[in-house]
Each structure stands twice: as structure tokens, then as C-alpha cells.
Amino acid sequence: PYPPPEGTRQARKNRRRRWRARQRQIHSLGERILTTCLGRPTEPVPFLLPPIERLRIDCSEDRGDSDPQGVGDSQIPGKSCDLLGSGTKE
């Protein structure tokens, strides 16, 4: 948690400086773990979006009665699109 705002101005400044240094250390440790143990790059892989013409919000897609051509389908073939989940806690 962020340090509490109490004490003298100098004490608060030092606490914030130490807190930021700790956060940097945690972040770099996380990057090292991702890189060495999981083989993941530290930078996120760019997410490719479909052309803007194919994007749409259509509630009928959930019921399965959308157009048969699949126009507007932004799913990646072979991948399920469960962004919001079922709404129940596990």
C-alpha cells in the first residue's frame, strides 16, 4: 500500500522515495520471473485487432442468429471468446 501521509515533509518525501524504489524492485523481479521461468517477453505482445469495418456490437451474436457470413466476427479462429465469463464467482 501507498505510504501514509503523516510525519514531516522530509519524512513523507523519503517514505515515498523508498516506496517507489520498492515498487521498481517488485516490477523488475516480476519481469525476471516472466522471462526466465515462463519464457515470456517482458514487453506485451501487440494485440492485433480486426479491421474497424468488421467490428460491431450486436446482441444477436450471443443468441446465434447473426448473419451466416460471419461479417463482424472479431473472434480468432479456434479460440473461445469468454471475456466477461459466466457472471458467477468460482
From Swiss-Prot:
Q: Which Pfam families match?
A: REV
Localization per record: Host nucleus, Host nucleolus; Host cytoplasm
| Motif Nuclear export signal and binding to XPO1 boundaries | 47-58
Name the InterPro entries for this protein.
Answer: REV_protein (IPR000625)
Q: Does the keyword Protein biosynthesis apply?
A: no
GO terms (BP aspect) = mRNA transport
Q: How is it modified after translation?
A: Phosphorylated by protein kinase CK2. Presence of, and maybe binding to the N-terminus of the regulatory beta subunit of CK2 is necessary for CK2-mediated Rev's phosphorylation.
At which positions is motif Nuclear localization signal and RNA-binding (RRE)?
Answer: 8-24
**Record text about domains:** The RNA-binding motif binds to the RRE, a 240 bp stem-and-loop structure present in incompletely spliced viral pre-mRNAs. This region also contains the NLS which mediates nuclear localization via KPNB1 binding and, when the N-terminal sequence is present, nucleolar targeting. These overlapping functions prevent Rev bound to RRE from undesirable return to the nucleus. When Rev binds the RRE, the NLS becomes masked while the NES remains accessible. The leucine-rich NES mediates binding to human XPO1.
What does the record's miscellaneous section state? HIV-1 lineages are divided in three main groups, M (for Major), O (for Outlier), and N (for New, or Non-M, Non-O). The vast majority of strains found worldwide belong to the group M. Group O seems to be endemic to and largely confined to Cameroon and neighboring countries in West Central Africa, where these viruses represent a small minority of HIV-1 strains. The group N is represented by a limited number of isolates from Cameroonian persons. The group M is further subdivided in 9 clades or subtypes (A to D, F to H, J and K).
Job of this protein: Escorts unspliced or incompletely spliced viral pre-mRNAs (late transcripts) out of the nucleus of infected cells. These pre-mRNAs carry a recognition sequence called Rev responsive element (RRE) located in the env gene, that is not present in fully spliced viral mRNAs (early transcripts). This function is essential since most viral proteins are translated from unspliced or partially spliced pre-mRNAs which cannot exit the nucleus by the pathway used by fully processed cellular mRNAs. Rev itself is translated from a fully spliced mRNA that readily exits the nucleus.
Under which name does UniProt file this protein? Protein Rev
Naturally occurring in which organism (per UniProt): Human immunodeficiency virus type 1 group M subtype A (isolate Z321)
Lineage of producing organism: Viruses, Riboviria, Pararnavirae, Artverviricota, Revtraviricetes
Q: Which gene encodes it?
A: rev
